[in-house]
Regions:
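Short N-terminal edge-element motif at the start of the domain
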Residues: 2-78
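Short amphipathic alpha-helical linker/capping segments at the junctions of internal repeats
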Residues: 72-94
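A eukaryote-biased signal for long
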Residues: 107-181
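Generic structural signal of hydrophobic/aromatic residues within well-ordered alpha-helices
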Residues: 65, 69, 88-94, 134-139, ...
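Glutamate identity and glutamate-enriched acidic tracts
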Residues: 3, 18-19, 32, 47, ...
Length: 181
């Protein structure tokens, strides 16, 4: 998703200061709340996750945030980590909404797409063009305020989006490191 045109890469650099944000992830629909976390550098021109040795660093408890942050010197210079979760990438809910719902009043799908964009770019794995195209279009339509019902005019489109999302999950998983202690 390195070419995902959610923002204009030709725009002049921003004067905004980068800061750290904690993102929580839920993949099991039977689990309440996040199952694991990562840190993201946000507010600049290169939003990115915590990376060490070419792998995205996730951690299973927020108490591991300092240990995780120490693994990525480029993010560590941004300061102390946030104390709480600032955004959620609810993969389970996103898949449910994409598969069967007509509305996403809380913007769960768009939030997930935006975080996946940063994570997939960090993997260095090239996303297949058909998946990149469909997720880019979905993000654009959701940003414009279109409902899922208006976007998904047929079931096969839902299936294609699900395939693209699951490709992202696989790419991120293959380039992940999970801190458990």
């Amino acid at each position: 998703m390195s070419d995902l045109p959610i923002f204009d890469s030709n725009a002049p650099p921003s004067d905004r200061r980068e800061e750290l944000a904690m993102a929580g992830f839920r993949v099991d629909p039977t689990h309440e709340g996040p199952q694991f976390y990562t840190l993201l550098a946000v507010g600049g021109d290169n939003e990115r996750p915590l990376v060490a040795d070419g792998r995205i660093v996730f951690f299973v408890r927020t108490t591991l945030v300092h240990k995780a942050l120490a693994m990525d010197p480029s993010l560590a210079v941004l300061g102390n980590p946030p104390r709480g979760v600032e955004t959620i990438c609810d993969v389970a809910q996103t898949l449910y909404l994409v598969n069967s719902q007509d509305e996403d009043p809380d913007g769960v799908v768009l939030d997930c797409l935006l975080i996946f964009d940063d994570l997939v770019r960090a993997t260095g794995i090239s996303m297949p063009g058909r998946y990149q195209g469909i997720l880019t279009e979905l993000a654009a339509r959701l940003t414009e305020g279109d409902s899922l019902k208006k976007i998904f005019t047929n079931e096969s489109l839902r299936d294609h989006v699900e395939d693209a999302l699951l490709w992202c999950v696989g790419a991120i998983t293959m380039k992940a490191r999970l801190l458990t202690s």
